[in-house]
């Protein structure tokens, strides 16, 4: 058998997340919700003629997008020469795309070998219309105190127990994680869109927050973003963040930010395990 590594992009809007969902016991009429993992497994099965398990690096939530999800699967050696990127894309729906496919060492594991992940959360800051498929974002029209949000983000970086930012539903040995950075960049700018001869400088139409960590708890990025939005709208002060972290109580933090603004950007691996992404 050969191990195949995939880098996958998808629009998560119509999927119940990455992971295949188990039907609840005692509900014979329950409907299986579509997931990205199931779609990729179905595509691989159509090529191989038999079922195969696909392992993802991260279990993105329902409605969350990806530009760099990593997965692996095992294929017969005789199929290693197949152009897997093209073959899978021919079987996948149009909102899922395999960007890269390559045979890697047998010991590679998409989830357990990951050393860092990057997620981006985008906010659209104007009433101006833009096609939803143009970019994943959350639409906001009120003012945001960006300086306060940056200050709050600084308190969230470092190694902490992030239990206050984990939603229920996952049992873990530890809720300690290391957040390497939370940075902010402008996304789409006004000059990306046609306008008149007016050259007056205009504020960005979109802002993006980038989160990098050794790993994230269930809905941790969306919960951190929810607290940043609380701070930006004056619901709490940046100086409140350390106490919220220390409390280890999800009820004391902000509501979870909507899934539609979040994208899994990239998964990082050590060089000795897998060549760095170009």
UniProtKB/Swiss-Prot annotation:
EC assignment = 5.4.99.12
- Per the record, the domain of life is Bacteria
Does the keyword Lipoprotein belong to this entry?
no
Residues engaged in binding substrate: 119
Active site at 61
Query: GO molecular function terms here?
Result: RNA binding; tRNA pseudouridine(38-40) synthase activity
GO biological process entries: tRNA pseudouridine synthesis
Enzyme class, top EC level, equals isomerase
Keywords from UniProt, A to Z, are: Isomerase, tRNA processing
Catalytic function, reaction form: uridine(38/39/40) in tRNA = pseudouridine(38/39/40) in tRNA
Sorted alphabetically, which InterPro entries does this protein's record hold? PsdUridine_synth_cat_dom_sf, PsdUridine_synth_TruA, PsdUridine_synth_TruA_a/b_dom, PsdUridine_synth_TruA_C, TruA/RsuA/RluB/E/F_N
Q: Which CDD domains match?
A: PseudoU_synth_EcTruA (cd02570)
User: Which Pfam families does the record match to this protein?
Assistant: PseudoU_synth_1 (PF01416)
Protein purpose: Formation of pseudouridine at positions 38, 39 and 40 in the anticodon stem and loop of transfer RNAs.
On subunit structure and binding partners, the annotation says:
Homodimer.
Family classification: Belongs to the tRNA pseudouridine synthase TruA family.
Name by which UniProt lists this protein:
tRNA pseudouridine synthase A
Q: What is the lineage of its organism?
A: Bacteria, Pseudomonadati, Thermodesulfobacteriota, Desulfovibrionia, Desulfovibrionales
Point out the gene that encodes the protein: truA
